[in-house]
A protein has these predicted regions:
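A short beta-strand-turn-helix
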Residues: 28-48, 89
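Acidic, Ser/Thr-rich intrinsically disordered and amphipathic helical segments
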Residues: 34, 63, 67-70, 110, ...
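Short cysteine clusters
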Residues: 58-61
Length: 135
């Protein structure tokens, strides 16, 4: 019994006992209805939302995917959303997206910044600028 029980403890697998840090993830939306419902729920928060407007055929978008995933892991206080312009053309049009990738930064339901193109450093700078919250 002891052997079976001990394998469930983290130290039995050389795992740390401390709790895991919550990893942010990129949320993909495939319907306008789900996006609008989610967007409405964010209007009451001060959380920065980064919308990644992308397309499956877009080479620079694919190059940015691992960078966005890294940012989501690093900036866990920021929400990262992915919207395919071919699936949700109405949402892309609403934000004036004309080129991919386009990153729209939103706080309290309002656009606070925008980056057009695969500009990793520019996006990082704007995320760091807008994620600062005053308590």
């Amino acid at each position: 019994m002891g052997a079976t029980y001990s394998t469930t403890w983290p130290e039995a697998h050389n795992m740390p006992i401390t709790p895991q840090i919550k990893r942010s993830q990129v949320i993909a939306f495939h319907t306008s209805t789900k996006w609008k419902f989610h967007f409405d729920s964010l209007k009451v928060t001060n959380k920065l939302v980064v919308i990644d407007f992308t397309a499956t055929w877009c080479g620079p978008c694919k190059n940015m995917d691992p960078i966005i995933n890294d940012f989501a892991a690093k900036y866990t206080d920021v929400e990262f959303v992915k919207i395919d312009v071919d699936e949700l053309a109405d949402v892309a049009q609403e934000y004036g997206v004309q080129a991919m990738p386009t990153f729209v930064l939103i706080k309290k339901g309002k656009v606070v910044d925008k980056i057009v193109g695969a500009d990793k450093d520019g996006l990082k700078m704007k995320i760091e600028k807008h994620r600062v919250m005053f308590i």
